[in-house]
């Protein structure tokens, strides 16, 4: 029997159906010589720090740095049953080999290898490496299974990534949390990402708006604009001068230009466009693309390539023909794809670009959930655009001289709409129309037929007022672009992988920052919180700079190719952890209070006037020399079965009394309405009394 282990139950079921393993068992399927089971994501992971000794259970500076000599692994508590199933299957006498069918990438390799190692399996291992869940792709993948050893370098890279994240994450999080008395989650990728958000926020906050002006001449129905003028009075005076002068066309330049077709989607560009068009978060887009992949409708989503392999021409042509028949916005269009633009095996590493599959022929698009349909249609539309003709146009720039200054008018004439016709029709078919970026809109009109030397006497003129604009806050689309480019200017130009994180991890990084309270979403915007801004301010450049992380990613890529030493990489990580702990032994008291939560005072102390705050068990005066305290479990309130709430405490502090309904009488066993009065006499304990409403 051959044991096949997939990453998820849904993928296992698809593979089992192709292999003929139809008999369902508890935690696996079997039949036709195969057993197909699954991991349910990360079944096994690196153990928490506490597993390495009692001294690490409590967070303290003295226990840092934590540098495991022998790494320990832990089975996820909620997945122990499935791990036990896999371990038993691996050790079954009739199982001769194990096939790793987890996702074809760094994390998929790690998920499988952790289970394989912790289960103590030593049976031969082979690797299934596919980019599509279509039946034909699965069959082809099983016909060319590779020896597991060929992916040892990929596993080494994945293991280094996991250990490096553990070492930097655990040590820096504990270090700065202890120093600042507040849980501060620090991460190799998330902290430089947060820094980019904080930098953008600072640029917006410090931006000073300035007005500027243009003088515009009306020339045969076209407008020619002057250079910027900073002074309104000068602009008005110049306008008057122009209206009494002659404008002469001194230059007329016509250029044929081409807007190249967009590339196919890799994961990051798909996430950016889905955010721009539909407002989906990076995580939502990844989840939707993964769901479509598991339904065999989309190719593997966690890719960083925007090309197909050279041998995929016929496949792409078949899918394009299918899309032309499926998409209403392609109805009646005679479309001949230019496939050569999207085929380039040299630019495909693990997986090719994201495109729909032929499974679409059997699928009713209308039956899909709207969000999945949006992603599938978006990927299909991009395949059509990428193989369409270029968009060509003639750009005309006319320069005029008037009153000693230059004026410019620009226009364009479309020669071939090309791929932009598909883009326009696709957008028009969308249920909700996205906002159009300035870069995408063709605002330039066709200019009149000007000629050099042409003159205009006393042209009409006007002054237009404008404001300089601050940078826009980051949204998911712009942040993903920034993460992708981060560190590029400081990184070796020959580096194969640059930027923060990988296409597969960037969505999770953004979500972690939001959940940690360092970033908040406002509509489509991603804004740093006060804690986020403070965290970036207190951390050293080594943790906030994207350069280091970008270098790490490139090193991990080289390890995956067998071109770099994993041991040397880990030694550098450990040295960094040691250096950080040595550099930050203590803080001044004012800095240590930086992350102390801002408390809202309930009122003023009736004895000294200082703010009164809520504690776990009481309401206390903030003046350490004052002993005024109202206890939540005061017998006065407990006897009357009244919860001493912050609302009651605030009313007592403000007016000395509060009306309360349904006070319990221990004497009569009944309830009544009354007024609780703060009867403070200045002693150790605060006294209260009840006043009953006066009878009319």
Residue ranges: model-predicted function:
Residues 9-16, 33-36, 40, 76-87, ...:
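Amphipathic alpha-helical transducer elements in NTP-driven molecular machines
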Residues 1, 101-104, 181-183, 254-263, ...:
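Conserved short loop/turn motifs at secondary-structure junctions
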Residues 2-3, 25, 79, 90, ...:
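Basic, low-complexity terminal or inter-domain segments flanking catalytic cores
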Residues 71-74, 102, 122-126, 147-154, ...:
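Short, polar/flexible loop-turn hinges at active-site or ligand-entry regions and domain interfaces
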Residues 135-217, 254-258:
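C-terminal or mid-to-C-terminal helical accessory/interaction module adjacent to the motor/catalytic core
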Residues 232-265, 271:
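Metal- or metallocofactor-binding catalytic centers and their adjacent structured scaffolds
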Residues 1-162, 166, 427, 470:
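Intrinsically disordered, low-complexity regulatory segments
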